[in-house]
Amino acid sequence: MKAISVPLKLINLQDDGFHLLMEVVVFKEKHLAVLDTGASRSVFDKSLIEQHLAETLKVSDEINAATLFTTTTTIQATIPLLKIGTLKIRDYETVAFDLQSVSDTYQQFGHPPIIGIIGGDILIQYSAVIDYKKLRLRLYKQK
């Protein structure tokens, strides 16, 4: 099984820890997302999803672990094509909520904005391996 190699960018958040960023393609546009091994599932910014999928959204109020156990309005949507490196994930079922404050924080520290968090659902499904020395994410597509 051949590995899909995705470059990572390591950023320092004011000596308070490091985050990994990666490029993703959503709605045929390149964006940056945070690679978060502690996130149970991948999420995308609500405004991005609303901009492209307004007519097909499902809205719900639920307790969401991704927002530190607070009640928030989440949006469920299907992204027609999510690309991570050469990996193409079609009809990706996602949850979206407001990531603007997260993106704003990155920008305040001189980093680019982010539109999503790539979490455990994708990382487990594609047997992800993070190589910190080479700053690469390897994903393995199941046959």
Regions found by a protein language model. Name each.
Residues M1-K143:
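Pepsin/retropepsin-fold aspartyl endopeptidases
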